[in-house]
Amino acid sequence: TAESFIDNTDSGSKYRQTATVNMYFASRKGDKLVEVPVEITYDATIPLEQLVIEQLLKGPSTIDGVSSKDIQATIPKDTILNKVTLKEHTCYVDFSEQFLNKPDGITAEVAIYSVVNTLIELPDITKVQFSINGKQELFYNDSMPFGDVFTRNLDLVQ
């Protein structure tokens, strides 16, 4: 009944939690990843993996206390997150086609592994698989294999 329904979507919900997540953005030169600890407040209504990707989409300029002169965004601004799903420790991320337009001055590896390494910082995620508008793409930026499952790559972290 309506009387027994509990609405916990209120912004003052006591179910809100805060987590510090290490996110990865591009170095100024664009060839390395820079680890940035980011505090994220969330509740049960939106999955943490979605919030983390949304922050990557916004870029580092929206994070308090972070100087964007040292780091840069890795995802094109007009990219849309269509869907994110977690199943059996694999995070499935579906972006719009704009994701394939690698930002100038950033290597393909840095663009992809900023998302992969950030998601794998979250509990229960060990692998990431990408799709574009619901379909598998074989290559990212016509150069890097993109159809496989990705695991963490710490070699790119400076």
What are these model-predicted stretches?
Residues 1-158:
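Bimodal "functional hotspot" detector
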